[in-house]
Design a protein with these regions (language model features):
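A cross-kingdom feature strongest in bacterial/archaeal respiratory oxidoreductases
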Residues: 1-34, 62-351, 361-362
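Non-catalytic, well-ordered alpha-helical segments in soluble enzyme domains
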Residues: 38-63
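Short Gly/Pro-enriched turn/cap motifs at secondary-structure boundaries
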Residues: 35, 139-140, 385-388, 397
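Secondary-structure capping and boundary motifs in well-ordered enzyme cores
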Residues: 23, 317-320, 389, 396, ...
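Primarily the internal scaffold of c-type cytochrome electron-transfer domains
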Residues: 325, 329-395
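Stable alpha-helical elements in mature extracytoplasmic
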Residues: 40-43, 393, 401
Length: 401
């Protein structure tokens, strides 16, 4: 016999967390539950014969054990509460290093190992029926509506696996059969990922669910491969071609770091004049290079009469988590277009976060090899490094400023 106990979304729920020892935070619902659901903790209370709601239980627990006479409403307003905690001495004496080394030694000498992970958007698959999350491009691969086997360029070339761009600009790739943990998964899309360690492959959990709406039944179920941190894996190329829904096919900045992606080191930021690490852009006007203020299409706007709101993003801390993209989608009622339209460059995200890899071919190297300015030079610049540095560039529509 099976029972279904529907629970609300976490944004419809009460809860608390201990961020670290002595630091507590409260979770409160942002909206009233949309459907006739009951929070899991309320269900537990009901099953134990209690008529108390989880909100009442949570508040009583905080007032008794956490707040120490302080105001519940203030803690709720502030979002966090700190209590005194004794320092704890941490030692490694209880870690059985010998057993860990023995486990590694017995892992085998397979050429390949597989790791499973969860994506930033879809997570473990509990929200796989949410089209916002399905359409959200992965911050690194920039691909949506899919999971896939990530493989390094070196291993892909050895196995004859390829990704290629077709005439309409969309990305295609080979399929592979994957065997690990005693399980074989057939026809898994293979995506060549810069920075993937040779000898390793990985695949995201949360996809391949069969109890969803038709358009949400995408990807392959990788849970049978999960069991431990390490699995030997065998991979063989399969017949057929997979069509990816990838929103970014230009993966390197191609020598335009100072024009499009402005970055510098902390040392240069502190010690060098701003003109050296933040060059002012120049434009051509009447056959002369002029600064931006000379070519503005609009008359200056007097913003002294009131507040002028602005948005600044600290690129040093942006990890492309994509929470802003989903928030923008929700706030502005942006439609979801589906995998096919994403594939043919018709995504409707108002906000995107481009991802750029570093390339081994730089201007300096091109000049040293005597190919700077040639077709070979520009072709080499399009190839990411096997162990690239990664930069993120948020690109917003005018509503954000």
């Amino acid at each position: 016999c099976q029972y279904v106990a529907t629970a609300p979304h976490y944004l419809e729920s009460w809860g608390d967390v201990e961020i670290k020892k002595g630091h507590y935070s409260l979770m409160q619902p942002t909206i009233h539950p949309l459907f006739n659901t009951r929070q899991f903790q309320d269900t537990l209370l009901k099953w134990t014969g209690s008529d108390q709601s989880y909100y009442d239980y949570l508040r009583a627990m905080w007032e008794t054990n956490v707040l120490g006479g302080k105001s519940w409403n203030k803690a709720l307003h502030d979002g966090s509460f700190k209590v005194g905690a004794e320092d704890q001495e941490v030692t490694l004496n209880e870690v059985d290093l010998a057993a860990a080394n023995a486990a590694l030694s017995s892992a085998g000498d397979s050429e390949m190992e597989i790791t499973v992970y969860v994506k930033t958007g879809l997570g473990d698959g509990q929200q796989a029926n949410n089209p916002w999350l399905q359409e959200l491009p992965d911050p690194i691969t920039r691909t949506s509506w899919d999971n896939y086997l990530l493989i390094s360029r070196i291993d892909a070339e050895r196995l004859g696996i390829k990704n290629w761009t077709v005439d309409n600009g969309a990305l295609n790739g080979n399929l592979v059969n994957v065997t690990a943990n005693g399980v074989t998964m057939n026809n898994v899309p293979a995506y060549i990922q810069p920075g993937q360690a040779p000898g390793s492959v990985s695949i995201a959990l949360g996809y391949g669910r069969t109890d969803l709406k038709k358009d949400m039944k995408v990807g392959v179920n990788a849970y049978p491969l999960a069991g431990s941190a390490y699995h030997e894996v065998s991979i063989e190329k399969a017949e057929g071609v997979h069509e990816f829904a990838c929103v970014q096919l230009q993966h390197t900045i191609m020598g335009r770091e100072g024009e499009i992606l402005k970055e510098t080191t902390l040392e240069d930021f502190v010690n060098k004049p701003v003109e050296e690490w933040n060059h002012a852009p120049v434009f051509s006007l009447d056959h002369q290079e002029v600064t931006q203020d000379k070519v503005d299409l609009w008359e200056p706007f007097d913003d002294t009469i009131g507040t002028k709101f602005n948005l600044s993003i600290d690129l040093a801390t942006c990890t492309a988590c994509a929470a802003c993209i989903v928030a923008c989608h929700a706030e502005n009622n942006v439609p979801v277009v589906g995998k096919h339209e994403i594939r043919v460059s018709r995504d409707m995200h108002w906000l995107r976060v481009d991802r750029y890899y570093s390339s081994e071919m730089t201007v300096e190297r091109g000049k040293e090899e005597g190919i700077f300015g040639s077709g070979d030079f520009f072709e080499a610049q399009t190839h990411p490094s096997d162990a690239p540095e990664v930069s993120f560039q948020p690109v917003m529509c005018q509503h954000c400023n």
